[in-house]
């Protein structure tokens, strides 16, 4: 039979795994495993095989391409999001999960509509822009005004007497996301306090090639709502150069953005039942919604598919872990966190399972080259997890930092559940974040598979451990 090596290993990869696991389950080594160890020898061996399987898998990456190309961006309230969710549920059913279901969640429904901005003085220029998520529109008309540039909220206060009737541009260099994003989130509130008619930000990004970046923004009761949008870093710097030359800057803005009534969406939940402690849960996942530009491949299609693929590989191994592995793909992380909040409340009040949520894992930092995980929990649990970390040295993903989590597992962590977030090489994350550049082609198959391997090792390791992860 004339077949390639890749075809041979793809076709026959299950046979040696099942045979080897059978031998391991009946080996003297397994029977004499160290009773004080968090992981048995058999669990460690299964983890090793899961890692190897993850590194050669093609299905997960192909599914990420399918999600990205056929459904694209998936903003809460959109048909694309619900169509993607239905496709995922159908595929999960094929994978052999013991239970797959959709959990209803009401989510915000903001629609961007048509929008544009132009620089009118001192030159004529189209300004690539994106309205920020939750912003109002311009009331069906073009809004024009003189621009006042500020570099911080303190600078805004210092110039407050010059603000009334003008458009405020926050031109703040990117330092860290946490420091810089405040101008996106709160910029409209602060500018409106002093009489601005609209506000812009230089996009929250570490690098730009004339790409504006969107993201959530907020209003505050009692303060007028004004349109709030992002322009590119390049255009913000251009405007600053004109201002330094003494030029007056005038901009026109048109936005059709609207907020509609809440819409029905869903969390996706899939389970592998535990063989000994089925009520004890290891949760892993990401958020299935995205912003309404690009494909949402990096943020967070990759995180969702990586968690799903990690669980699928556990099914494929034929070894059922002692505890239940639950994949949760949360809806509405980007502009409301409704999916995560609803899941945590449901787990606490309806399922009554918070105490049996052993560990919550999240991947929402891209699926670039993995470094390991950041963990928030007890010192004893940290030491237990270190046994798993050491199994990931061959792919350079053995880092286990103290402190970690994620937005979607945050509500669970606030209720006492230990949490951990996947850490990756993040240099390019904010190049693409919340922009039209977040597309599948930015991702690398090898990096993705290593992320899957890292997630699978922790998910199976904790689920099959001899001891319950310490609180």
Regions flagged by a language model, labelled:
Residues 47-55, 69-79, 145-153, 173-188, ...:
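Second-shell loop/turn segments in exported
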Residues 38-78, 211-216, 289, 359, ...:
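N-terminal capping segment at the start of a domain
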Residues 36-37, 49, 65, 69-167, ...:
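Noncatalytic luminal/extracellular "stalk/propeptide" segments of secretory-pathway proteins
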Residues 124, 140, 228, 277, ...:
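Metal-dependent peptidase/peptidase-like ectodomains
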Residues 78, 127-227, 396-398:
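Extracellular/luminal Protease-associated
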Residues 312, 316, 430-471:
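His/Asp/Glu-rich mid-to-C-terminal helical/loop segments that flank catalytic regions of hydrolases
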Residues 44-46, 121-161, 217-297, 312, ...:
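Soluble metallo-hydrolase cores and metallopeptidase-like ectodomains found primarily
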Residues 175-176, 183-186, 190, 264-267, ...:
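Acidic/histidine-rich catalytic neighborhood of metal-dependent amide-processing enzymes
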